[in-house]
Swiss-Prot record:
Keywords: Acetylation, Cytoplasm, Cytoplasmic vesicle, ER-Golgi transport, Golgi apparatus, Membrane, Phosphoprotein, Protein transport, Transport
Domain of life: Eukaryota
Protein's name according to its UniProt entry: Coatomer subunit delta
InterPro entries: AP2_Mu_C_sf, AP_mu_sigma_su, Coatomer_dsu, Longin-like_dom_sf, MHD
UniProt organism field: Mus musculus (Mouse)
Sequence ranges of Basic and acidic residues compositional bias: 168-177
Residue numbers carrying N6-acetyllysine: K233, K241, K309, K351
Lineage: Eukaryota, Metazoa, Chordata, Craniata, Vertebrata
Annotated localization: Cytoplasm; Golgi apparatus membrane; Cytoplasmic vesicle, COPI-coated vesicle membrane
Length: 511
């Protein structure tokens, strides 16, 4: 079966929405659809008509027609089955089978049509799978949002660091007896402002104050006093900004985190004419007392070719996975070639991969309850004390080859009890009083920084601190499946290519 186009048109042959699966001009498809009503014989009950070059397979839908245009040598039974699936898809997105309703949801219909047919061939999907695929979240959008949030957090942390340095300089100056004008903003007016905005307070807690050598005594002059006053006003401006955000952030050097754990953003990838995106998403659920309830990982290699001269290529895949993942190639990929030689190529070597579109050529899946497969273990130990609970949380990286970036461990807190009292911490934390959560932020977890802990105290019960949720991003994939080489079908000559790898969290919970 070779499907040329799928369209919804009026009884006069006017195209409302049309999706072509082969290269075809707009004039050509409009001409084919305009000729369609003239070919129908109202006296017969057939659901297809033929011309010298194409076959129309159609189904009436009130005042409209669902039409498939195929080659004449296609299988009519498969065509009719595909037509039924197309006809069932349209009511999923359109409340009424009318022209204006179809036009309003035309892009939704085109996306659904693309899930049914790829490269002119029917995909093995049903209606439920089409609905799932079209509603699926965008990995690229998640990565973009995560990177942007990280940059915002880093900017806020830098602002707080500068504010603390200015406050420390002010205290050192006061110890030397050089209190300058301009610091009155930290007096009663600042306190009253804080009480007015009690619902959105911002506090900077210093559990380990840096030891700053006192400045040498110098004669105090008018110019020095003016400079100190200007610095005090700058401190006031920082504190006013902090008080408007409703968060609590603290940086501590009590743990193992040092300056080498600071995240360095990788430069943008230089995309070659052949570009691969390797994406993995993990869903994991653990019990608070230990034991992996379920872990499921989905991965895919997406191929994008931007130059048609590299359309006929083969990908050399290196699979070093030892966890037992299940691999599945695209229906148009030669499965025997992949099984025998780990090469990804089309069944028909004379055909080319699509140009300027992302094509999923290989996907894999891993599902397990084996605890040794957990990439990052989280242990949360709340113990009741006289004034509430002392909570100790530990993390440990079990996969030494991974490097996890922008790790955020979110712990729920009881409502109405105020901010937690932080003891020891590796990394940074943020208290969100509006959502009643404590976020433990770690820029990097790798083999050099594979374990750490957080201790805090707060009124509450042990059950108040679950479920614990984890999120992270990694530029190394979990299953160790890579494309090592790309060659042309003719001549087996190597082709330059680029690779982009992303390992994301879909859901990561400790219940």
């Amino acid at each position: 079966m070779v499907l040329l186009a799928a369209a919804v048109c009026t009884k006069a042959g006017k195209a409302i929405v049309s999706r072509q699966f082969v290269e075809m001009t707009r004039t050509r498809i409009e001409g084919l659809l305009a000729a369609f009503p003239k070919l129908m014989n109202t006296g017969k009950q057939h659901t297809f008509v033929e011309t010298e070059s194409v076959r129309y397979v159609y189904q009436p839908m009130e005042k409209l027609y669902m039409v498939l245009i195929t080659t004449k040598n296609s299988n009519i039974l498969e065509d009719l089955e595909t037509l039924r699936l197309f006809s069932r898809v349209i009511p999923e997105y359109c409340r009424a089978l009318e022209e204006n309703e179809i036009s309003e949801h035309c892009f939704d219909l085109i996306f659904a049509f693309d899930e049914i047919v790829a490269l002119g061939y029917r995909e093995n999907v049903n209606l439920a799978q089409i609905r799932t695929f079209t509603e699926m979240d965008s990995h690229e959008e998640k990565v973009f949002r995560a990177v942007r949030e990280t940059q915002e957090r880093e900017a806020k942390a830098e602002m707080r660091r500068k504010a603390k340095e200015l406050q420390q300089a002010r205290r050192d100056a006061e110890r030397q007896g050089k209190k300058a004008p301009g610091f009155g903003g930290f007096g009663s007016s600042a306190v009253s402002g804080g009480s007015t905005a009690a619902m959105i307070t911002e506090t900077i807690i210093e559990t380990d104050k840096p030891k700053v050598a006192p400045a040498p005594a110098r004669p105090s002059g008018p110019s020095k006093a003016l400079k100190l006053g200007a610095k005090g006003k700058e401190v006031d401006n920082f504190v006013d900004k902090l008080k408007s955000e409703g968060e609590t952030i603290m940086s501590s050097n009590m743990g193992k985190r040092t300056s080498e754990a600071t995240k360095v953003h990788a430069p943008p990838i230089n995309m070659e004419s052949v570009h691969m995106k390797i994406e993995e998403k993990i869903t994991l659920t653990c019990g608070r007392d230990g034991g992996l309830q379920n872990m499921e990982l989905h991965g895919m290699i997406m191929l994008r070719i931007s130059d048609d001269k590299f359309g006929r290529i083969r990908l050399h895949v290196e699979n070093e996975d030892k966890k037992g993942v299940q691999l599945q190639t695209h229906p148009n990929v030669d499965k025997k070639l992949f099984t025998a030689e780990s090469l990804i190529g089309l069944k028909n070597p004379e055909k080319s991969f699509p140009v300027n579109s992302d094509v999923g050529v290989l996907k894999w899946r891993l599902q397990t309850t084996e605890e040794s497969f957990i990439p990052l273990t989280i242990n949360c130990w709340p113990s009741e004390s006289g004034n509430g609970c002392d909570v100790n949380i530990e993390y440990e990286l079990q996969e030494d080859n991974l490097e996890l970036n922008d790790v955020v461990i979110t712990i729920p807190l009881p409502s109405g009890v105020g901010a937690p009292v932080i003891g020891e911490i590796d990394g940074e934390y943020r208290h969100d009083s509006r959502r009643n959560t404590l976020e433990w932020c770690l820029p990097v977890i790798d083999a050099k920084n594979k374990s750490g802990s957080l201790e805090f105290s707060i009124p509450g019960q042990p059950n108040d601190f679950f479920p614990v949720q984890v999120s992270f991003i990694s530029k190394k994939n979990y299953c160790n499946i890579q494309v090592t080489k790309v060659t042309q079908v003719d001549g087996n000559s190597p082709v330059r290519f680029s690779t982009e790898t992303t390992f994301l969290v879909d859901k990561y919970e400790i219940l």
